[in-house]
Regions:
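Active-site-proximal beta-strand elements of phosphoester/diester hydrolases
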Residues: 1-10, 143-152, 170-172
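Cys-nucleophile CN-hydrolase/nitrilase-fold catalytic domain and related Cys-dependent amidase chemistry
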Residues: 12-100, 175-177, 190-194
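Sequence-level detector for tyrosine residue identity
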Residues: 15-18, 76, 85, 99, ...
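Short, surface-exposed connector motifs at secondary-structure boundaries
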Residues: 30-36, 139-144, 164-169
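CN hydrolase (nitrilase-like) catalytic-core segments centered on the catalytic cysteine
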Residues: 46-67, 144, 153-262, 280
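Active-site catalytic loop in hydrolytic enzyme cores
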Residues: 74-164, 184
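Cysteine/selenocysteine-centered motifs that mediate thiol-based redox chemistry or coordinate metal-sulfur cofactors
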Residues: 125-142, 146-149, 247-281
């Protein structure tokens, strides 16, 4: 696998692999998608600048797992968030690459790394806050979201911290236990009351966009898997979600577009996301 080759310091940089990623990006551009989400450990770090230039040219945001990086016998698992933006004074488009460092490596992932006398550098070790996991809150074009990398989702504490603050959770995965993660994503969507955008490798499947709604309506898009990586487009309605969240229970019960918001959900968060005033003094 690409992971095995990467940790053995013989990374796959074949033209075929480049073509596969390029086809996903080209499909997103062709379909006029706002954002493309790709799985964990998907994109080599050397290709990120090229990807960023494509993003700024086409006004496309990308969230992608970065292939494991080895520095001084330490292994890092990063997720790149590439956000295009227009410079206010010149009207020129640029893009910024932001990184999330995986806080919790999967046990098997860590075992394979340590079997090669390497050290899995979890985000909690590489950040200033040694005892707490670190996650980021992103705002792009009025869309508030956060990113989790695979095994991080198994932490109840970690996946609950952004309730009321986000429109969506983006989960990048390389995971064979699709049933377990399916249960997590469905619970997370209702507990945090947000959209969940989950992408897994085509080998294992269950990439999806889900919402906190009735079982028969919850999946906006769901892909079982296959031999080839493909890009599919789904649409989320931020205004519809926020308007629902701003209602009291009686109004939500009559609406029925989504499941009611959970206890302790702060409706003011939806109001501030809508107005773009989150964290303003």
């Amino acid at each position: 696998s690409n992971f095995d080759q990467a940790v053995m310091r013989k990374p796959n940089r074949s033209y075929r692999r480049y073509q596969q990623i390029a086809e996903l990006v080209n499909t997103a551009v062709r379909e006029k998608a706002d954002m493309l989400v790709m799985p964990e450990a998907c994109t080599p770090k050397e290709w990120l600048p090229t990807l960023a230039r494509t993003c700024e040219k086409n006004h496309l945001a990308v969230v992608t797992g970065v292939e494991h990086i080895i520095e001084d016998n330490c292994v890092y698992n990063l997720t790149a968030v590439i956000l295009p933006y227009e410079e206010k004074w010149t009207g020129q488009w640029h893009s910024v690459i932001l990184y999330h460092s995986k806080n919790h490596f999967a046990p098997e992932e860590k075992r394979m790394i340590e079997s090669l006398h390497l050290r899995a550098m979890e985000g909690i070790e590489s950040s200033e806050a040694k005892c707490d996991a670190k996650y980021e809150l992103y705002s792009w074009n009025g869309f508030w979201f956060t990113v989790y990398c695979c095994f991080e989702l198994t932490s109840i504490r970690d996946r609950s911290i952004f309730q009321s603050y986000i429109d969506a959770v983006i989960a990048v995965e390389w995971n064979h236990d699709v049933n377990y993660y399916s249960n997590i994503i469905e619970s997370l969507s209702r507990d945090i009351h947000c959209y969940c955008i989950q992408t897994n490798t085509s080998e294992y499947g269950d990439s999806r966009i889900t919402k906190p709604s009735k079982t028969e309506n919850k999946d906006i898009l769901r892909i079982k898997g296959g031999s080839n990586a493909t890009a599919h487009v789904g649409t989320i309605d931020l205004e519809q979600l926020r308007e629902f969240q701003m209602k009291a229970y009686s109004g939500q019960k009559e609406d029925k577009t989504f499941k009611p918001t959970p206890p302790d959900f702060d409706y003011k968060g939806a109001y501030e996301r809508r107005k773009g005033t989150m964290f303003e003094c």
